[in-house]
Amino acid sequence: MKKIITLAIFLLKVCCGNLQAQPFPSADEKIPFLCTFSKNSQKDWGDDDFVQIYFFVVPQTEKNPIYIRVFDPDIGGKYDEVHDVFNSKTRFSVYGGKGAASNPDAKKQTPTGNFKSGIQLSSKTFGDDAAYDDKWYTLGPFNPVEGELQPDGYVFKLIIEGMDGDDGNLYKMFLSSLPNENKAIEGGNAYTYEYSFRMADTKGSISHLYPFVSAGITAVKINVFDFDDDGILRVVSVAKKGEITKSSGNAVWLENTHKITTEELNTSLDIQFVKQQDSKNNNVVVYITNQYGELMPFYATPIGGVPKYKFKIGVKVDN
């Protein structure tokens, strides 16, 4: 297992040298919003634990201050999901230093134990506040070396917690080199081990997630919560034209196992959520593990690029 993790980190450094940090979720993912519900919400609204954890990677060569910007951080107004009346709060907290990203509790599917590991660098709680509705809020500045030094760069952890209330907070994020503008940091990226996001409302729309398959992985298990029978799950890769599985029902988990071929090693998968109904406000939670049960990160910018199926053309030889 250590060999798998070490090789994955090495390939991340090789493949990502020219990446530029993008919005989280990124344009490639075609996800309208990330979401976190407050702790008194019903789970059938689409959040299994009311906490989300995201990681932002800053290259070691970056010497200028960095910022984590959040779009629409309040919980009320234009985009957020109300239950009767808005009465909720959401807390955004940034952590750096030793253990922020490497502590095993920070990488669990369910946030328990010391998932707030590291040093808290910033924290802000939002309620129903028009001053932050449909606007960007900036956390920072942070010196890059305040993150935890990992092989792929300095890593900052952002924890979003649903506090009191029963409403859903929909938001986006950006790792930026400027406080008042979304300017990409060359070589930056972002990832999470569990994705909680809003599906698009339109029938036929497709959302994408991109886990990286490192050497040594023989199978992946894709776990989906509360897809509401809203469509199908399709897996595309350099070797898979589109393996289709059924979606999960309301407020339940569904696990699908997919074998990994040699051609798929050291590439990203394209996990597609294909919407087949014109239904609104469908929020989904997803995580993926390898054959050892280890969580695999989803990268905002797919490692090695968006995977494309490679058609194999057979040649018939006449004797």
Can you say where each PLM-predicted feature lies in the sequence?
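Bacterial Sec-dependent N-terminal signal peptides
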Residues: M1-P23
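Extended, solvent-exposed segments with strong compositional bias
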Residues: N40-D44, K107-P151, K246-N266
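Post-signal peptide N-terminal segment of secreted/secretory-pathway proteins
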Residues: I53-F56, Q60-N114
